[in-house]
């Protein structure tokens, strides 16, 4: 027994030492993992989308795009006044909303023309008159300046888009044929809603509403100038009386209803506000309500922010503002470019991944083609700044796909944060 005592003593001491040890643990932040699954059934021969350009040609479009520009002050009847509706601006030194629109549109139509079936409607239909009835006449067949194209090959579509650009460039900033009248938005939306060509179930259908003012001109408006708080008069100097008793009141509700009616017909409305009136006062709330009803969601990323006065939601990858707001030619061109990227049929062999859809590491992306896991390589697919680009035989399969024989592709991307 004595021979074992040292061993027992050693064990006792060892146990005591172990019992007295202490450990320091460093806090570790839990790993948050999110997975995004993107499923695409690709048909390379999808029909090209229809887009109706509904362009506001009201009198305010001839106002300066930058009223603070000293060159926009002109002599008129013995005093200095801001050029615009009453006195034409010298557009070389004082660009107007209309001339800025004319400068922004060509690139949009040229870059999108072969991918999109465009049409053009302007409003109001003043017929050159300046009275209340003429100023508030909504769009009609007479202001449907260019219908949807009959041919769909790239060259024909590009020529069609070029003709639409020529029509817009042909509307002068001053003189006969210049922008005149009010902003009968709800009635004009109702007109394009009734066009059979925009109700094509085999295509995506869009209306791009480009307006610089608050909607008005609704003679059936339930509000009147007799109640200024409810009327929210859109006429200068609170001019909602006589012929403008109802026509001059803000026509927000009917405009939203008109957009909802379009959406019920599977026609999405994209709203662009252009100028100071849509950026302040009642403007943002009205355009936001219309844009939300229109169903078009503005996507964004660090590379493609939402623009001045707006932010990108990193969780959804969408802008917090649903409508586009542009204050000058550059901002309008950017809005049109974003729309072009969103609506035209993309490169068939590219599946875009935006914002939160992208993995935090390329190794955390898994691709399935027709249910079969497909590793990345130069002959299968690669991840680039735009998304997943397919090459080789997979791209050939995509290009040969038809509505009857599409290609099913599934992307699973993991984000660690």
What is each stretch, according to the model?
Residues 1-18:
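Sec-dependent bacterial lipoprotein signal peptides
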Residues 20-417:
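P/S/T/G-enriched low-complexity
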């Amino acid at each position: 027994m004595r021979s074992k005592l040292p061993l027992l003593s050693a064990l006792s001491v060892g146990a005591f030492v172990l019992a007295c040890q202490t450990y320091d643990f460093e806090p570790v932040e839990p790993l948050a993992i999110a997975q995004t699954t993107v499923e695409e059934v690709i048909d390379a021969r999808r029909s090209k989308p229809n887009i109706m350009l509904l362009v506001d040609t009201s009198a305010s479009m001839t106002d300066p795009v930058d009223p603070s520009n000293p060159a926009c002050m002109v002599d008129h009847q013995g005093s200095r006044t801001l050029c615009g509706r009453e006195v034409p601006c010298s557009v070389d030194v004082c660009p107007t909303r209309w001339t800025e629109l004319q400068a922004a549109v060509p690139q949009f139509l040229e870059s999108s023309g072969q991918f999109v079936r465009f049409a053009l409607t302007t409003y109001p239909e003043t017929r050159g008159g300046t009275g209340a009835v003429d100023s508030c006449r909504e769009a009609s067949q007479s202001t449907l300046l260019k219908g949807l194209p009959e041919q769909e090959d790239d060259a024909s579509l590009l020529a069609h888009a070029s003709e639409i650009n020529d029509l817009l460039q042909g509307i002068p900033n001053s003189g006969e044929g210049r922008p005149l009248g009010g902003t009968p938005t709800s009635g004009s939306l109702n007109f394009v809603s009734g066009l059979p060509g925009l109700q094509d179930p085999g295509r995506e259908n869009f209306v791009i509403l480009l307006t610089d003012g608050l909607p008005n001109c609704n003679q059936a408006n339930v509000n009147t100038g007799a109640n200024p708080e409810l009327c929210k008069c859109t006429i200068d100097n609170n001019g909602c009386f006589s012929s403008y008793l109802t026509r001059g009141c803000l026509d927000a509700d009917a405009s939203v209803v008109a957009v909802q009616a379009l959406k019920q017909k599977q026609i999405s409305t994209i709203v662009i506000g252009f100028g100071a009136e849509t950026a302040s006062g009642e403007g943002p709330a009205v355009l936001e309500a219309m844009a939300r009803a229109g169903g078009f969601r503005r996507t964004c990323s660090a590379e493609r922010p939402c623009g001045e006065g707006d932010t990108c939601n990193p969780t959804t990858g969408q802008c917090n503002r649903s409508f586009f707001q542009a204050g000058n030619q550059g901002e309008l061109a950017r809005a049109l470019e974003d729309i072009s990227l969103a609506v035209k049929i993309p490169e068939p062999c590219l599946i875009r991944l935006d914002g939160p859809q992208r993995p935090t590491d390329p190794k955390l992306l898994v691709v399935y083609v027709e249910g079969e896991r497909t590793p990345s390589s130069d002959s299968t697919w690669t991840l680039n700044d735009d998304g997943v680009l397919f090459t080789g035989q997979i791209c050939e399969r995509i290009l040969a796909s038809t509505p009857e024989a599409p290609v099913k592709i599934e992307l699973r991307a993991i984000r660690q944060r």
